[in-house]
Swiss-Prot record:
Cofactor (UniProt): heme b
Cellular compartments annotated: Plastid, Chloroplast thylakoid membrane
Organism annotation: Euglena gracilis
GO biological process: photosynthetic electron transport chain
Regions that span the bilayer: 21-35
Entry keyword set: Chloroplast, Electron transport, Heme, Iron, Membrane, Metal-binding, Photosynthesis, Photosystem II, Plastid, Thylakoid, Transmembrane, Transmembrane helix, Transport
Organism taxonomic ancestry: Eukaryota, Discoba, Euglenozoa, Euglenida, Spirocuta
Protein name: Cytochrome b559 subunit alpha
Length: 81
């Protein structure tokens, strides 16, 4: 049951001027936006991940790994102190 779906072939799309006019702006802006998102530290606040300087503290020099899934909240409290 071969047939046409009515869509444009991919080769027609990527060889069109309209495609490159649109994507010459959107692709670089995604990279710049991502770079700003990470370099300003907003990504750490939004996703709740520790900043690179917060992985190890003066009192704790090992990796903060959860070893007991039933007492995970207690272990997290110990890591954040």
């Amino acid at each position: 049951m071969a047939g046409s779906t009515g869509e444009r072939p991919f080769s027609d799309i990527i060889t069109s001027i309209r495609y490159w006019v649109i994507h010459s702006v959107t692709i670089p802006s995604l990279f710049v936006g991502g770079w700003i998102f990470v370099s300003t530290g907003i990504v750490y606040d939004i996703f709740g991940t520790p900043r690179p300087s917060e992985y190890f503290t003066e009192t704790r020099q090992q990796a903060p790994l959860i070893s007991d899934r039933f007492n995970a909240l207690e272990q997290m409290d110990q890591f954040t102190k």
